[in-house]
Amino acid sequence: MAERLIIVSDMWGSKRGLWITSYLGYLQQYFDITYHDSQQLANLDVKVHTGENIHRAFVEGGIDTAVAHLMKKEQEPAHYLGFSTGGTIAWKASLMGLPMKSLYTVSSTRLRAEEKRPDCPITALYGDNDVYRPKTDWFKELNIKSELFKGFGHDMYTDEKIIGKVCLDLLKSVTQKPKKLHKIKVA
């Protein structure tokens, strides 16, 4: 039976999400995937769809609403992939008890304000041109595996090179068998 993968979109959701089809194309044959549009989880009703207005709506209660709705919709342990705001939503839901096997975030800059980490393996990717990414010390303090990509900004998750890397990482994480321990006889 395939592992479950829950994908939580960036703040744009399906409205600017053609890139998500590349992830689905790579991953759907290996995972049982559920996709959540962050705007729908947050019940956003923004009159003018600018980045600034959508961002403000998430910060002013939308993230909390999205966390509550994600927790109602997902109750079984699963792997999570979150893009930008979606990674923050998944992170906060895990801290509130959402069962999570692993969390893979890409460009989730709001995590820089978090002081506690979910109790699961975490991978966080950021572009080195993303000025709002967490500082290096944050990753060390929370013991988080991270990678920084040269020449990429916040929307790096829409780039085919990054899409391929993320998908390969996720596939490796669920297809690699644990290494066997060799017992040594002591005389």
Predicted feature residues:
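A conserved short beta-strand
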Residues: 98-110
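Serine-hydrolase catalytic machinery in alpha/beta-hydrolase-like enzymes
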Residues: 2-73
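Hydrolases whose catalytic domains are alpha/beta-hydrolase-1, hotdog thioesterase
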Residues: 89-93, 114
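Gly/Ala-rich beta-loop-alpha elbow adjacent to hydrolase catalytic centers
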Residues: 81-90
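Short, conserved loop/helix-junction motifs that constitute active-site signature segments
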Residues: 97-98, 112-120, 139-142
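Short beta-strand/loop motif that positions the catalytic acidic residue
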Residues: 124-126
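Conserved loop-alpha-helix segment in the C-terminal half of the alpha/beta-hydrolase fold
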Residues: 133-145
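Catalytic histidine-centered segment of alpha/beta-hydrolase-like enzymes
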Residues: 151-161
